[in-house]
């Protein structure tokens, strides 16, 4: 009777990326270009260079895309083309500072705004390759790997933006990240550095971290907040052991 079942359009997602161990990773999140904080970004880059990182993971929301969001644009807001140009310049600067590093760029909820805008306002353009974010930001030419709708895994650690796990905001977000992931993970999205450690039933250490942001600390839409600038340096050994410096920029 199985042949009576109608066709299913379910598709298993295969968008996660697994990278090898034995590496040191600089994690930068939530730059929100063109509202990025230059001093905070430079501090993260400096620490990455002094730590001899060989990998950079951009943990999402590198772009803000305020101009194409569902929210009203502020007077004098930069055009979408200007936002893209500034994003290109930031990515070029990161690549220049880490010429030999592997660089990965995870899609955040602000990057999702581009697809949402096209689907709502010009759905017939949705499949045009020149309108894909990786093409607009020239990621291929800069040898930056785009990770759309997926996680990055390295050893026992997983890297995500954070919007994928709803309900992790508020008090103790790193612990909430653990309750959602059930494993070691690092996310951004919440703009507040925090860490949580526990052990599983076999005694294995599990650690979850929320990294700070690298954007405008007092945006017009949320001028009084408890956000903090920050980044992380993660070492993953050959054996898969993970050491995390979740740094706050004061």
PLM ranges: what are they?
Residues 120-158, 162, 169-172, 210-213:
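Active-site-proximal loop/helix segment associated with metal-binding centers of metalloenzymes
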């Amino acid at each position: 009777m199985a042949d009576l079942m109608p066709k299913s359009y379910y598709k298993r997602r295969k968008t996660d990326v697994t990278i090898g161990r034995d590496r040191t990773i600089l994690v930068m999140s939530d730059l929100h270009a063109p509202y990025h904080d230059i001093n905070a970004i430079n501090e993260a880059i400096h620490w990455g260079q002094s730590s001899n990182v060989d990998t950079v993971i951009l943990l999402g929301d590198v772009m803000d895309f305020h101009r194409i969001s569902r929210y009203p644009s502020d007077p004098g807001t930069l055009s979408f083309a200007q936002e893209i140009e500034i994003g290109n310049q930031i990515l070029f600067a990161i690549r220049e500072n880490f010429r030999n590093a592997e660089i990965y760029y995870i899609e955040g909820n602000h990057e999702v705004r581009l697809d949402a805008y096209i689907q709502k306002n010009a759905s017939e353009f949705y499949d045009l390759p020149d309108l894909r974010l990786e093409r607009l930001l020239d990621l291929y030419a800069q040898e930056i790997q785009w990770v759309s709708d997926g996680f990055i895994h390295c050893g026992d650690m997983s890297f995500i933006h954070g919007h994928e796990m709803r309900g992790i905001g508020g008090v103790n977000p790193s612990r909430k990240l653990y309750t959602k992931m059930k494993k070691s993970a690092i996310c951004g999205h919440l703009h507040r550095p925090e860490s949580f450690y526990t052990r599983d039933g076999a005694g294995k250490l599990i650690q979850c971290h929320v990294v700070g942001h690298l954007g405008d600390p007092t945006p017009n839409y949320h001028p009084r907040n408890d956000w903090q600038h920050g980044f992380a340096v993660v070492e993953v050994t050959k054996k898969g052991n993970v050491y995390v410096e979740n740094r706050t920029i004061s």
